[in-house]
UniProtKB/Swiss-Prot annotation:
This protein's UniProt keywords: ANK repeat, Cytoplasm, Hydroxylation, Repeat, Ubl conjugation pathway
Chain positions with (3S)-3-hydroxyasparagine modification: N246
Source species taxonomy: Eukaryota, Metazoa, Chordata, Craniata, Vertebrata
UniProt KW Repeat keyword: yes
This protein's encoding gene: Asb4
Protein name, UniProt field: Ankyrin repeat and SOCS box protein 4
Predominant cellular place of this UniProt entry's protein: cytoplasm
PTM statement from Swiss-Prot or TrEMBL: Hydroxylation at Asn-246 by HIF1AN may provide an oxygen-dependent regulation mechanism for the function of ASB4 in promoting vascular differentiation.
Location in the cell: Cytoplasm
Transmembrane segments: none
Taxonomic source organism: Mus musculus (Mouse)
Coiled coil residues, start to end: none
């Protein structure tokens, strides 16, 4: 009886059908898929456990902990797999057989997956078939919140044009709108589109941060220490649409504080010109100039002298004179920054802390500048020209940046009044 094959059990047969069904999905064999569904051999919403190391199919609640091996695979229906693999024909077959379009076996609907992988064709099909545009994932994100790459901009536009809510906040501890998300990821085109379609420019997340504050903070790529032009464009767009430049987060930081923390003179200039208050203090009692001072030494791509110049020309309070050695500690390799700050005082005397703050190699490298610094900052008064500059600046106060360029003076004198560094102090 060795040649007789044992009959396949019902469970074994179901297992084989499930395997064939999954194989048809993976190979885009929509003909075979259709035949299986017509014969009703398997439920159209059958859930599979598939490899998903990048968690494209999965979404979890914030704060939940799972062992790493659990995160290497996810549960998914045929719809999710068809979207993930870009198999439009299989997607259509499943929808024609009444697959549940908003199913979330592992926290995401097929529409969430389509937006995350930026598959515009699948987004259109799912929307045409009735997918919920504002449905939350298990992590509390809508489909618009999953549009985080330049390639997904068209997906976001499609959703908005079909009625997705551009002001819907995430249902989690962040409470961010799609505008916050686009600002974070530097999608300037999408930010402009959201604003044109009714996004509230001053919407606040759970930390009371506006999209302007988010874009300002993320304008510095911390790993590369480079500034993002896209984030600068976003800030320009938001300010042009009347974003509140002095909005404060839950630490009382304004966007100017965040720009100062990044030592980003482009954004600092943009915000000061838009009416940012240079002397606003945060919860730590720090104004923007203190943040520039704190980070100057760890921002290699920055031009701190411009940051100080901008703030002082917009009326920022000067560094407390007994603490001036901290300016030298932070800027010892950038004499121009020291020059700008020291020229904001009528007179300031050096002390031993100044000398200790300068490494010997920097002292030697910038000897002419440091020699002039110690020579000028002694017991004798500064030049009459410098004192005249201080008198004019004191009279103009926070209008220096506007008033001085309008004076009938030669350009070199205007630059002198605006603290333009010259490389030496006299």
């Amino acid at each position: 009886m060795d040649g007789i094959t044992a009959p396949i059990s019902k469970a074994g047969a179901a297992k084989l059908v499930k395997k064939d069904f999954l194989e048809a999905l993976k190979t885009n064999d929509f003909g075979k898929l259709k035949a299986i569904l017509i014969e009703r051999q398997i439920d159209v919403d059958t859930v599979f456990e598939v490899e998903d190391e990048n968690m494209i199919l999965a979404s979890y609640k914030q704060g939940y902990w799972l062992p790493s091996y659990k995160l290497k695979s996810s549960w998914a229906t045929g719809l999710h797999l068809s979207v993930l693999l870009g198999h439009v024909e299989c997607l259509m077959v499943l929808l024609d057989h009444n697959a549940t379009i908003n199913c979330r076996p592992n926290g995401k609907t097929p529409l969430h997956v389509a937006c995350e992988i930026a598959n515009l064709e699948c987004v259109k099909i799912l929307c045409d078939r009735g997918a919920k545009l504002n449905c939350y994932s298990l992590s509390g994100h809508t489909a618009l919140h999953f549009c985080t790459t330049p390639s997904s901009i068209l997906c976001a536009k499609q959703l908005v044009l079909r009625g997705a809510n551009v002001n819907m906040k995430t249902n989690n501890q962040d409470e961010e709108t799609p505008l916050h998300t686009a600002a974070h990821f530097g999608l300037s085109e999408l930010v402009a589109f959201y604003v044109e379609n009714g996004a509230i420019v001053d919407s606040m997340n759970a930390h009371m941060e506006t999209p302007l504050a988010i874009a300002t903070y993320w304008a510095l790529r911390f790993k590369e220490q480079e500034y993002s032009r896209e984030h600068h464009l976003i800030c320009r767009t938001l300010l042009d649409n009347n974003a509140e430049v002095n909005a404060r987060d839950d630490d009382f930081k304004s966007p100017l504080h965040k720009a100062a923390w990044n030592c980003d003179h482009v954004l600092m200039h943009m915000m000061l010109e838009a009416g940012a208050e240079a002397n606003l203090m945060d919860i730590n009692g720090c104004a923007a100039i203190q943040y520039v001072l704190k980070v100057t030494s760890v921002r290699p791509a920055a031009q701190p002298e411009i940051c100080y110049q901008l703030l002082l020309n917009h009326g920022a309070a000067r560094i407390y004179p007994p603490q001036f050695h901290k300016v030298i500690q932070a800027c010892h390799s950038c004499p121009k920054a020291i020059e700008v700050v020291v020229n904001a005082y009528e007179h300031i005397r050096w002390n031993i802390k100044w000398r200790r703050a300068i490494p010997d190699d920097d002292l030697e490298k910038h000897w002419d500048f440091y020699h002039s610094l110690f020579k000028v900052c002694c017991n004798t008064p500064r030049t009459l020209m410098h004192l005249s500059r201080c008198a004019i600046r004191k009279a103009l106060h926070n209008r220096c940046h506007k008033a001085i360029p309008m004076l009938s003076l030669p350009l070199p004198l205007k630059k002198y009044l605006l603290l333009e560094p010259e490389g030496i102090i006299y």
